[in-house]
Amino acid sequence: SYSDIWKEYLIPSKCNDRGLVWSDIWIGKTLLFDFDSPKNPLWAFERADKVATHLTSEYGAECFVVFSGSKGFHVHVGLEDSRRLVGIDWEDYQDHKDPLKVIGQAHADKVVELASEAGVNYTTEDRSSNFRQGIVRCPYSIHPKTGQIVWPLDMKSIEKLRSKDNLTIEGVAKTIHRWDIPNQST
């Protein structure tokens, strides 16, 4: 099955059996913070903003805050900054039986630690996007449950959201991007 084949790409020895070099496929992993609050998305934003601000001011990290299109916000940390903050060199793990599992756990633990440094409790948040095969929606894609756009925030959008007291998911979307998309067929 495709699932079985995919699993073979996760393990260096299985890649080797297929004539592939594991380190050519897996080039890095980034830190990702996932903040959700279905009833109050601005609470999720405030926590994401606090973590991104902390990482930028304390570590000089390049961070991107993204509206998830649903319940909250993601903070993406750039690849080089993620490597530096986690302190893992992928080459040190390529001979491990399941390096992506070990590396993913290190990333998941680091988001809890860094959020705590920023004064944000992350112990109940979803850390799965940092695990071995963690995924998040791609910016500018459409969230299938809400129909909202997964939207990266620029400073103008961040400032607008900082000035709000309470918004629904739709209210967040209206605040950060236009709804009347030109040339869209009806």
Language-model features and meaning:
Residues S1-P41, V120-D126, T186:
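SsDNA-processing nucleotidyl-transfer enzymes
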Residues E8, K14, N40-E58, V77-T123, ...:
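Helical (often loop-to-helix) elements that flank the catalytic cores of nucleotide-handling enzymes
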Residues W22-S23, C63-G69, D126-N130:
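Short beta-strand
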Residues T30-F33, E62-D92, I135-S141:
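Histidine-centered divalent-metal-coordination microenvironment in nucleic-acid enzymes
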Residues E117, R127-V150:
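Accessory, usually C-terminal, subdomains that scaffold auxiliary metal cofactors
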